Amino acid sequence: MVTRKMDKRLWSLQGMTALVTGAASGIGYAIVEELAGFGAKIHICDISKTLLNQSLSEWENKGFQVSGSVCDVTSHPEREKLMQTVSSIFDGKLNILVNNVGVLRGKPTTEYVADDFTFHISTNLEAAYHFCQLSHPLLKASGYGSIVFLSSVAGVVSLIDCGSIYGLTKGALNQLARNLACEWAKDGIRANAVAPNVVKTAQSQSFLEDVSKKEGLLSRTPLGRVGEPNEVSSLVVFLCLPAASYITGQTICVDGGLTVNGFSYQPHA
């Protein structure tokens, strides 16, 4: 019989540490709120100093243990500096790495230029890959490590409006989660990916304001609506909890049923 004491341990992040990238707004912000609610001590980074300071102030008023750094994740030196800061704050140990930061420039494939490719790869994929490398010794030292990648349904099925480069970066994150789950299991580190459908954030606002695009998306989504940030953050944080200790290498869609709903692509003549 499982005791109440054991139940609390399984559903608590008390005493654990976390790094969440791009977390001053949107889904990242919701992830921080959820992690803090379970007792984690968190460090975040964001490229916007204004948003970072605003969010840190809000969390301080709520009594959350959150610190933050301004960081351009496309910069190799800035990524290294961030991890040095994290190591110093958390005494060389880290339990949770959430690779949340991501960008999207949706275009037809023939219209992409070299800068678009570099922009997506460096932000969505290279940064996440490098953060995993840098955090490995800290995650291993903690004795309980969990990596969560914020992927997308665009990395699972073809979503033309998101663009091919965005889709390939998210698909790569799903595969990276599988590889790390196998390679780093011996070090006590799990890795999973969470793949949301379109979620109500500032980043998705222009898409949702396009009536035809929004209607097209909702017609393929069984639940008939877009997601909320907290509907994604709840799964992200679950994957970090001891209760999820046997889950690794998975890509889990938070999509209102989009990826299991059959639909046909009809190209324009």
Swiss-Prot record:
It is an enzyme of class 1 (oxidoreductase). Pfam families: adh_short_C2. Its EC number is 1.1.1.-. InterPro entries: NAD(P)-bd_dom_sf (IPR036291), SDR_fam (IPR002347), TR (IPR045000). Keywords: NADP, Oxidoreductase. NADP(+) binds at residues 19-43. Belongs to the short-chain dehydrogenases/reductases (SDR) family. SDR65C subfamily. This is Tropinone reductase homolog At2g29320.
